[in-house]
Amino acid sequence: AEEKERRRDSLAEKLKIWRQEKEHEKMWTEKEKEYRKRAITSLVRLNGLSEFMEQIDAKSIPKVAVTNAPRENAEMMLKALELDIWFKDLVVLGGECEHAKPHPQPYIDGMRLLGLDPIEDAKDCIVFEDSPSGATAAVAAGCYVCGVLTSQKAEHLEEVGVHMIVKDFQEFSGRFYSC
């Protein structure tokens, strides 16, 4: 009788945990759905981004988008900002890598996706990052990192070792092409 009661208690505990996990999953799904609904109407391209993308396309410079956003969010953002035309299948999602940012793995995977050697070619890659987590990953991958001021303060990006900070792509192009 004791063994039967212990198994019943164990099963009840497992069911309780399972219900909590399902409820958490449901809440997460709803939160992400609400995020996408709000974000799609408020996303705005940074100044100079379209011109910058056209310039690197004209020079046949390979590019890849690397993000920690869940797939649905990443696809929505790229489409809403009309960046999907430039990246197509060239997107690395941190959540689908062995390690997500701030680990360098997503950037290493991005370089490999472009046919680059992460050890030999990282120094020739430029990464635009607006988060300390992403900048940390890119610096650790050995890339040249340009911090973009969207929601973070410059000092937060400087602390993790970015090489340059700009407010948008127009400023980057002005500084880069004047060299």
Where are the predicted features?
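Generic anion/oxyanion-binding catalytic loop in active/binding sites
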Residues: 1, 13, 20, 38-41, ...
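Conserved donor sugar-nucleotide recognition element shared by glycan-biosynthetic enzymes
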Residues: 4, 45, 103
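Alpha-helical substrate-recognition element adjacent to the catalytic core
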Residues: 1-21, 26-28, 33-38
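Asp-based, Mg2+/Mn2+-dependent phosphohydrolase catalytic module
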Residues: 50, 54, 71-179
